[in-house]
Amino acid sequence: FLDDLRAKLEEAGDNPRTLLNLRKRIAKIRVFDPACGSGNFLVIAYKEMRAIEAEINRRRGEPDRASEIPVTNFRGIELRDFPAEIARLALVIAEYQCDVLYRGQKLALAEFLPLRNENWITCGNALRLDWLSICPPTGTGVKLQAEDLFHTPLDQAQIDFENEGGETYICGNPPYSGGTVQSVEQKEDLEAVFSGRANSWKSLDYVSGWFVKFADFARHVDACGAFVSTKSICQGEQVARLWPIIFQSG
């Protein structure tokens, strides 16, 4: 989708109206990584989108304009507490770095503090959680909110998407784990995903669970998705066991 945005920027040239429409489109895009680790994919997506937005503002003669891309539109799920906090902090830092780069240090510092305490990175098991509650089509999701940036989230709170109605892109690098090396917990995760769908799921790679969860998510949200995965789910015996389930999901 970043390539498409860059192509649209090239097509827009210096046309103010076309550039404005592209900026509005970018501001509504949601990026969701249900295996986000320390947030690398989310940070890259955010920085690349800010670069495109900055070029739009430059061409429109508005170089100091505040960004319209909400960092809370970049959401993730991470199993472990510490990487989840790192992912959230990495996005906060990325926002500050982009503000310094495109608007100057003075304006960036004025808006950087106090640090946000919203927790748009969910710490939990992506194969057990309802993705629609984390990245919902309506724009509001039930989220865990911490008392401060580094505190373990305890209470449920809602965080609105600041710009609703945009495109949703899902990406990630889920754990692979072949069928013969999965832990008991991972087998139970896959059973929760495939229960009622198939009986011959035990030999599937662990990453296959993310594809099925995305297929379920895409039934309710007009979304595009891509995961880094093992080639074995696209060849050999796993193809017949996994892909019919995904295709049947629509």
What residue ranges belong to the model's regions?
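SAM-dependent methyltransferase catalytic region
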Residues: 1-250
